[in-house]
Amino acid sequence: MNPLISDFQTPQQRTPVIVALDFSNEKDTLGFVRNLDPTLCQIKIGKELFTATGRNLAESLINQGFKLFLDLKYHDIPHTVAQACKVAADMGVWMVDMHASGGRRMMEAAAEAVAGYGTKPLLIGVTVLTSMEQSDLAEIGLNTAPEEQVIRLAKLAQSSGLDGVVCSAQEAAPLRRELGQDFVLVTPGIRLDVAGNNDDQRRIMTPAEALAAGSTYLVMGRPVTQAADPVAVLREVNRVANLEAN
């Protein structure tokens, strides 16, 4: 267990922050995580880091007390995705995602695969990647606005047994209205200051804006990992979250 445990969380409190560990190797990852407090954030491992390090690093981080979001965006035949979700559950993963565009049978198979676990991972559907705009959707044959496609896929994910979806903060408010208060909304594209942003997240908001819109969890990568004082950033976002909840 990471020794840097704070008294931030009570049974009624939950940090909304998920830190994206966008590193390429185990050394840099562990060097960064060493100074984090698992009560101030969850952590996310994506394709690059998982491909480079495998499950050993993931299990090590879980054993240090972190809730781990395994962000591999499964998209395959139902049996393959179901088996992958079972492996994630066996590892003790907190959250795992899959493309909702994989369809109902794939998502239902995933939900059924983990249903028997006492503590099962949250199953999250990926709707429309936050880097995509309407012109990108048109190029792949979807003549619809991103917001409409997000709602369509989110409804499908919910009715297929998933716990929530990934969506931009702009879609959070309409999804809350459509899908209720218990559906988990995981929001990337969170920046401390959206002015002058020029990275690959197109539909972005600040933490306060995203929480007010209805997001459950906020995915933050570079604003935390490249900060001079990452813990100070996490404490500030959690302070904003507490104010938003009150």
From Swiss-Prot:
Pathway: Pyrimidine metabolism; UMP biosynthesis via de novo pathway; UMP from orotate: step 2/2. HAMAP family: OMPdecase_type1_B. It is an enzyme of class 4 (lyase). Catalyzes the decarboxylation of orotidine 5'-monophosphate (OMP) to uridine 5'-monophosphate (UMP). Homodimer. It comes from Neisseria meningitidis serogroup B (strain ATCC BAA-335 / MC58). Substrate binds at residues 22, 44, 71-80, 130, 191, 201, 221-222. Belongs to the OMP decarboxylase family. Type 1 subfamily. It comes from the Bacteria. GO terms for biological process: 'de novo' pyrimidine nucleobase biosynthetic process; 'de novo' UMP biosynthetic process. This is Orotidine 5'-phosphate decarboxylase. Its EC number is 4.1.1.23. The active site is at K73. The keyword Transcription regulation does not apply. Keywords: Decarboxylase, Lyase, Pyrimidine biosynthesis. SMART domains: OMPdecase (SM00934). InterPro entries: Aldolase_TIM, OMPdecase, OMPdecase_AS, OMPdecase_bac, OMPdeCOase_dom, RibuloseP-bd_barrel. Coiled coil: none annotated. It catalyses: orotidine 5'-phosphate + H(+) = UMP + CO2. One of its GO terms (molecular function) is orotidine-5'-phosphate decarboxylase activity. The gene is pyrF. One of its GO terms (cellular component) is cytosol. It holds the Pfam family OMPdecase.
